[in-house]
Amino acid sequence: MTQQKQTQSYLVPFIIMVVLMALVGLITNLNGQFQAPMQAAFLQKSGSLTNALTTLITFAFFSGYLAMGIPSAKCIEKKGYKKTLIIGLFGLIAAFGLYELSAYIFETVDLEKFQAEVADPNAVIIPVAYYVFLLAGFVAGSAMTFLQAVLNPYIVACDVKGTTGVTRQSIAGTANSTMATIAPMLVASVIFAGKSGLDIALSSLYIPFLVLIVLVGGLIVALMNIHLPSIASAEKKEGEVLEKSVWSFSHLALGVVAIFMYVGVEVCIGNNINLYGQSLGFKPEQAALMATIYWSLMLVGRLCGSFLSSISASKQLLITSTGAGVLVLASIVTNNPYFLVGAGLFHSVMWGAIFSLAIDKLGKYTSAGSGALMMGIVGGAILPLVQ
C-alpha cells in the first residue's frame, strides 16, 4: 500500500515534466522557425550580410548551451535538481519578456525609419530590435540548458504505476517531438498568418508569448508546492570531492562530440530548410510544411524508437547514423532537399542513444557529465553558421 501511494504521488510531477519536455520542443523550434519571418522583418536592408545575420538567430540561442553547460551542472551540485529547474523556468520567462520587448521596439522605434529607407537601394539598416531578439534567443537557450540538465533524470525518477523509466522517457519524448512538429506551422500560419516582409506585424508576438509567460508562471507555482523524487544517487554528496575531471571519461568526451554533430545537423536541416525552400521559390507556408514534415518524421521515429528497448544503444546509434548519412549524401548528389527531410526519421533515435552511452556508469559524476553534454548542444549554433 505504501509503495502504491508513493507511485501515485509522482503522477502529477511526471505530468509536469512531460509538459516541460513539450515546452522545450516548442521553444527550441519556435526560435529556429523565426529565422525566415525575422529575416523578412528585420534584415531586408542588411545587404550581403542578410543570410549570416539570419543564422545568428539560431547561433545566439544555441550559444546559451555552451555558456551555461558547466554553470547548470554546478547549480545542480549546489542547489539540487528542483531549484535548478525553477531557475531555468524563471530564465525562460525573462526570455519571453525580451522577445516581446524586441517586437515593441521594432513597432515603436525602428519601423518608421525602416519604412523611410526601404526604397533606397544603397541603404543598410539593422534595427535595434534585431539585437534585442538575439539577446532573447541567448537567454532562452541558457534557460533551456538548466531545464534539459534536470528533466531527463526527473522523468526517470518519477515512478508512475504501470510504467518503466523507458516508457516514461518515450512519453516525454513524444510530447517533445509533437510540439516541435507543430512549431513551424504555428509560426508561419498562426502567428504571422502567412505574411512576409514589412507586412509582418511583430505585434503578433505579444499574445503568444504572454500565454507562455502565464503557463510557465503556473508551472513554477506548481513545482514549488509539490514533492519531487530524490535523485541523490546521481549527485555529488555535500563535501564530497570529485577526484578527477569529468573529461577523463573517454565515452563522455565522445558523447559531447556526438551531441555536437547530432544537434548541429538536426538544426541545419530543421531550421535552414525553411530558408532553403524559400530560396527555391516556395511560399512561406510551403517551406514551413517541409520543416513540419521533417519534425513529423522525427515524431514517427520517436514513437518507433519506444519499441527498440531490446536493441542496445550502441546498435541503435550505428544504424540510425548510417541511415541519416546515406540520406544526406543522396541529397548532395541529387540536389533534392526531400532526402534531407527524410533524415528526421533517423535523427529522432540518436539523442537518447548518445545520452545513455555518454553518462553510463558515471555515478557521482553524472550531474557534471550532463552539464558537459549540454555544452555539446552548441553544435546547433556553430554548424548552421558554417553552413
Enumerate the language-model features and the residues they cover.
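Intracellular juxtamembrane helix-capping segments at the cytosolic ends
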Residues: F146-V160, S348-T366
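Extracytoplasmic
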Residues: V12-L43, Q148-N152, I269-G277, L383
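Helix-loop-helix hairpin linking two adjacent transmembrane segments in secondary transporters
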Residues: G165-H227
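Extracellular/periplasmic helix-loop-helix junction of adjacent transmembrane segments
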Residues: F34-A67, K113-D120
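Central cavity-lining transmembrane alpha-helices of secondary-active solute carriers
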Residues: T55-K74, T292-C304
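Helix-to-loop junctions at the C-terminal end of transmembrane segments
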Residues: A67-Y81, I191, G301-A313
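C-terminal ends and interior cores of transmembrane alpha-helices
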Residues: F90-I125, G323-T334
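Extracytoplasmic gate region of multi-pass secondary transporters
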Residues: N31-A36, S245-T292
